[in-house]
UniProtKB/Swiss-Prot annotation:
GO terms for biological process: cytochrome complex assembly. GO terms for cellular component: plasma membrane. It comes from Shewanella sp. (strain MR-7). ATP binds at G43, P44, N45, G46, A47, G48, K49, T50. This is Cytochrome c biogenesis ATP-binding export protein CcmA.
Length: 216
């Protein structure tokens, strides 16, 4: 992973325009996201929050504009960016036919990790005792925590998370917020969407980028 101790800006957007089904979601959108930032993309449903996250993650192309990682166009540093990026979409990305432990093992190994204790990691997300349970038999909250468990064993600098608090109880949300603060304090950044109010991350620590629904 990239050593960014001497680098401040991690992810940048320059004049991004996104059009879906002939409707402009946002245009000429520019911003910098720095090491230590926790950034919430906010706005009503249909405003383009998920589309923006996917563009920042390099999973979708904007109609116009550029995205940068460490001041280099992500299309020219794709491998380096992918190594330093953790993207979790609003769908859990958990295979129902695998156990919680097998899902975590798969997700960590596919991300290049080979030295970890799945039971200890699952315990951190309150899944101790559910290691061998099929994901398809878990509750919605347990399903989501299975997906989020990889955050507790991850050294990517850029976390892009679409609705990470979905189906998570208040205690779980607070634990995630603490993890986000720790990650940012260690030189990473967190970019997320959520419809929930955060209790631990206060406004003086949270940056917000607002997208508004456009009718034309």
């Amino acid at each position: 992973m990239t050593n960014i101790t001497s680098v401040n800006t991690l992810v940048s957007a320059s004049k991004l325009t996104c059009i879906r089904e002939e409707r402009i979601l946002f245009d000429e959108l520019s911003f910098d996201i720095n090491a230590g930032d926790i950034v919430q993309i906010e706005g009503p449903n249909g405003a383009g929050k998920t589309s923006l996250l996917r563009i920042l993650a390099g999973l979708s192309r904007p109609y116009a504009g550029q995205t940068f990682y460490l001041n280099e166009d992500i299309n020219r540093c794709r491998d380096e960016y992918n190594e330093d990026l953790l993207y979790l979409g609003h769908l859990a990305g958990v295979k129902s036919e695998l156990t919680a432990e097998e899902n975590l093992n798969f997700n960590l190994r596919i991300s290049g990790y080979d030295d970890f204790d799945t039971a200890a990691i699952l315990a951190k997300v309150n899944l101790a005792g559910f290691e061998e349970a099929l994901a398809g038999h878990l509750s919605a909250g347990q399903h989501r925590r299975t997906a989020l468990a990889r955050l507790w064993h991850n050294d990517c600098k850029v976390w892009i998370l679409d609705e990470p608090f979905t189906a998570i109880d208040k205690k779980g949300v607070e634990e995630l917020e603490q993890l986000f603060i720790q990650h940012a304090d260690n030189g990473g950044c967190v970019i997320l969407t959520t419809h929930q109010d955060m209790g631990i991350i206060k406004d003086d620590r949270l940056r917000k980028i607002r997208l508004d629904y456009r009718f034309v």
